[in-house]
């Protein structure tokens, strides 16, 4: 029985590790697909895609998975037509939520998204109901180090709009059109880039209590479990 118990624990640990790896792979795939949609499928001319591929390789994602993600985002999978759809609505506590999807079946996707909102006490809205609370920006997160002055200078000189300083990271914001050139500039300046993407940023964040925050996080988790969902944005602090 001791051996059985030990194996049960090993299986449990392996299941947790597999789940963790699955989430890491899912994020890597989404980062690649977002980069392709924003800047095209060529990593030689799309710095965000090149970095997303490097991050995917760093977590041991197979090359076939990387290629499939690029082909899916660029519409090159044979016999399948994907389209981009954005859903918007309110989560618990009136938190505004935007859900970017890439799907080959709109009916399936909207049913899944609506179910997640309803189950979490939120409501799926109509087009334009919350999108006015967000603006599209390039966001580059880099690690702070002794080279940060040169990194900030490179970012600003290449067109960055703002740099937010936190304890361990710098968050560089750009116009979408300037994103790639700023990304390349800070990379050349020696920045260790942790995340980089063009996405939606809330223009005004709202405070919610801990219980509401947990409900919103559960809604986001439910949405992100859907393979059709590419990105989820919200205005919760």
Swiss-Prot record:
Taxonomic superkingdom: Bacteria
Protein name: Probable transcriptional regulatory protein NIS_0560
SUPFAM superfamilies: YebC-like (SSF75625)
Key words of the record: Cytoplasm, DNA-binding, Transcription, Transcription regulation
Locations listed in the record: Cytoplasm
GO cellular component term, pick one: cytosol
Originating organism: Nitratiruptor sp. (strain SB155-2)
Cited InterPro entries: Integrase-like_N (IPR017856), TACO1_YebC-like_2nd/3rd_dom (IPR048300), TACO1_YebC_N (IPR049083), Transcrip_reg_TACO1-like (IPR002876), Transcrip_reg_TACO1-like_dom3 (IPR026564), YebC-like (IPR029072)
Single annotated GO MF: DNA binding
The keyword Transcription regulation is annotated on this UniProt entry: yes
GO biological process terms, semicolon-separated: regulation of DNA-templated transcription
Gene3D superfamilies from the UniProt entry: 1.10.10.200, 3.30.70.980
Family (UniProt): Belongs to the TACO1 family.
């Amino acid at each position: 029985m001791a051996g059985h118990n030990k194996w049960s624990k090993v299986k449990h640990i392996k299941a947790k590790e597999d789940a963790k790896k699955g989430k890491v792979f899912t994020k890597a795939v989404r980062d690649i697909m977002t980069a392709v949609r924003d800047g095209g499928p060529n990593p030689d001319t799309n710095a965000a895609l090149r970095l997303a591929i490097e991050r995917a390789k760093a977590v041991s994602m197979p090359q076939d998975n990387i290629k499939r993600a690029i082909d899916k985002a660029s519409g090159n999978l044979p016999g399948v037509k994907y389209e981009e759809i954005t859903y918007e609505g309110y989560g618990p506590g009136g938190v505004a939520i935007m859900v970017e999807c890439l799907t080959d079946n709109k009916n399936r996707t909207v049913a899944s998204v609506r179910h997640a909102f309803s189950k979490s006490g939120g409501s799926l809205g109509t087009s334009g109901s919350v999108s006015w609370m967000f603006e599209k920006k390039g966001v580059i997160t880099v690690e702070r180090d002794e080279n940060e002055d040169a990194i900030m200078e490179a970012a600003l000189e290449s067109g960055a709009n703002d740099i937010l300083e936190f304890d361990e990271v710098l968050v560089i914001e750009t116009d979408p059109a300037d994103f790639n050139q700023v990304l390349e500039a800070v990379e050349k300046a020696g920045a260790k880039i942790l995340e980089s993407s063009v996405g939606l940023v809330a223009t005004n964040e709202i405070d919610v209590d801990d219980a509401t925050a947990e409900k919103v996080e559960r809604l986001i988790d439910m949405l992100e479990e859907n393979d059709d969902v590419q990105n989820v944005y919200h205005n919760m602090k």
